[in-house]
Regions:
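A short hydrophobic alpha-helix cap/turn motif
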Residues: 66-67, 92, 130, 171
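Short secondary-structure capping/turn micro-motifs that flank functional sites
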Residues: 41, 63-64, 82, 107, ...
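Ligand-binding pocket segment of bilobal, Venus flytrap-like solute-binding proteins
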Residues: 6-88
Length: 175
């Protein structure tokens, strides 16, 4: 069904999801029509209602559909299979060699923040991250499929690597 298959995706050109779909379609030699939705609910409804063939989404956002058996994962965008999706192939297993882009968020301080305040905040955030209640929340959203905590050096490395990836892709896409 080359060119006739449809996938619900976010509408923002240049988004992580759109860039990843570019990687997938180029690596697999596919044409897939991406149907844009700004909000999650219409994307999920499109798959539930049969208006699209597939959905690009992070698993935590559709957990209730996965748990209810209404959605089924068919591909993970990780270098290795996460244990919670042990029966779902990775993009690499399907012959795609691109490095996955990761969604990330962080905490930032003013550039002139005192060093002792920065150190205390780093300690507090790491301590909060390690709390059982937060780990349970992370597990409920499938946010433990990768190591999701980064210290300052790790965050800088992730951000800088992501910038380089996006820069190359945006240039190739003409953005």
């Amino acid at each position: 069904q080359n060119g006739k298959s449809t996938i619900a995706n976010v509408s923002k050109e240049g988004s992580m999801e759109r860039v990843t779909m570019k990687f997938i379609t180029e690596a697999a030699g596919l044409k897939i029509q991406q149907i844009s939705f700004d909000k999650g609910a219409p994307r999920y409804g499109a798959l539930l209602g049969g208006q699209v063939d597939a959905l690009f989404e992070q698993p935590g956002d559709v957990r209730k559909f996965l748990d209810a058996g209404k959605f089924k994962p068919i591909l993970t965008i990780f270098n290795e299979r996460p244990s919670v999706f042990a029966d779902v192939p990775t993009h690499r297993e399907m012959g795609m060699s691109f490095e996955p882009l990761l969604r990330f968020r962080g905490f930032y301080v003013h550039a002139n923040a005192p060093a002792n305040r920065v150190e205390w905040l780093q300690w507090a955030f790491q301590r909060a991250y390690c709390q059982d209640s937060y780990q349970k929340f992370n597990e409920s959203k499938f946010m433990t499929v990768i190591d999701s905590y980064r210290d300052t050096a790790g965050a800088r490395k992730l951000i800088n690597n992501s910038i380089a990836q996006y820069r190359d892709v945006y240039k190739a896409m003409g953005l």
